[in-house]
Amino acid sequence: MDRTEQKSIIEGLLFVSGDEGISPEQIAKVLEIEGNEVINILEEMQKECEGAHRGLQIVQYAKVYRFATKKEHASYYQKLIDIPTAASLSQAALETLAIVAYRQPITRTEMEEIRGVKTDKALQTLVSHLLIKEMGRAEGPGRPILYGTTKEFLDTFGLKTLDDLPPLSEENEQMNEADLFFGSLQEISK
């Protein structure tokens, strides 16, 4: 096995070991090479990561090596953490989101007729989470705002297009759309 392949395998081992890391001894056993050779390879890999424009570095903590992100990119990682997810949505917001997903473009009044309650707060939450947006205005008195889902909605729920939404069969149309939608999403993600 050549050095390039050894580095490739070590890189994979570092990845699968996650935050716990992996010791040079463990790597040596897997690759069936000497421990000091593993340390030499790890040091080479550390230098390669430092010199390259890469987002990861190899660090050593408490006799184990692991991948870590670079400190200079911390502000970007914080932005990702700050992006709200569907898990942080209330039941009312999830129900409203399911209605918008299946019935878009749809007005607030139409959503309230389906849900039987006001949707103002849920709509504000969904817009602030970038899951829905204003799609235009309906014809008719007052020209109410039409809502639809966004690209972020598709990304959040692992959908490529709206066509990937689980279909509503005639018998399921009587079910709560939120229950059907999120139950079907669980099936997709298995």
Curated annotation (Swiss-Prot):
It is found in: Cytoplasm. GO terms for cellular component: cytoplasm. Keywords: Cell cycle, Cell division, Chromosome partition, Cytoplasm. One of its GO terms (biological process) is DNA replication. Transmembrane segments: none annotated. HAMAP family: ScpB. Homodimer. Homodimerization may be required to stabilize the binding of ScpA to the Smc head domains. Component of a cohesin-like complex composed of ScpA, ScpB and the Smc homodimer, in which ScpA and ScpB bind to the head domain of Smc. The presence of the three proteins is required for the association of the complex with DNA. NCBIfam families: SMC-Scp complex subunit ScpB. Participates in chromosomal partition during cell division. May act via the formation of a condensin-like complex containing Smc and ScpA that pull DNA away from mid-cell into both cell halves. Belongs to the ScpB family. This is Segregation and condensation protein B. It comes from Bacillus cereus (strain AH187).
